[in-house]
């Protein structure tokens, strides 16, 4: 919906970028917006994540007026609150009995022990301010093997979602919540 408007925003913090809005409506009329990319955050450091949240909150002073002025339908937007945690898409994955690869995804491979079927596009976020995210493929349907949920050397544990045994590129598709719920 608002990709062009997002890319036109010039953040005060040079280590941020506004991307297309992900919008979720709530029953009370509020909307949740996921659109600010915060670069330079170490997802394994609580201090770095806290600094990222503080930087994002400081950016709201400039971002909210920009949204009101440039995003049709948001002329009366008000900030109710910001997220208490950062959404970190990529950090680390378990080493499982099988690692789902980008070839598995793009070649629509079946697996003998499939536990779910994925079809979400391979959506890769930028990792630096000089680059933009991209969709590198749109699979028809691929199988997620049970083996990719089973960590090596750990008993009685299954790992689903973005931390399962996927390569980073395969996770661009397999990370989505519906697959983890399947």
Describe these PLM feature segments.
Residues 1-182:
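Flavin (FAD/FMN)-binding glycine-rich loop and adjacent Rossmann-like elements that form
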């Amino acid at each position: 919906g608002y990709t062009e408007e997002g890319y036109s925003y010039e953040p005060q913090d040079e280590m941020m970028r506004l991307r297309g809005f992900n919008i979720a409506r709530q029953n009370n009329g509020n909307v949740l917006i996921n659109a600010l990319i915060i670069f330079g955050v170490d997802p394994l450091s609580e201090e770095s994540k806290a600094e990222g949240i503080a930087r994002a909150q400081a950016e709201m002073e400039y971002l909210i007026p920009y949204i009101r002025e440039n995003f049709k339908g948001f002329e009366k937007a008000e900030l109710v609150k910001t997220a208490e945690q950062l959404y970190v898409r990529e950090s680390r994955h378990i080493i499982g009995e099988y690692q789902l690869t980008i070839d598995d995804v793009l070649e629509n491979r079946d697996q003998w022990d499939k536990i779910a079927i994925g079809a979400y596009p391979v959506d890769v976020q930028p990792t630096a301010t000089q680059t933009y995210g991209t969709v590198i493929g749109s699979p028809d349907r691929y199988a997620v093997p049970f083996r990719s949920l089973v960590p090596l050397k750990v008993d009685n544990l299954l790992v689903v979602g973005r931390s399962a045994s996927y390569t980073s590129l395969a996770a661009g598709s397999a990370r989505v919540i519906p697959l983890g719920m399947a």
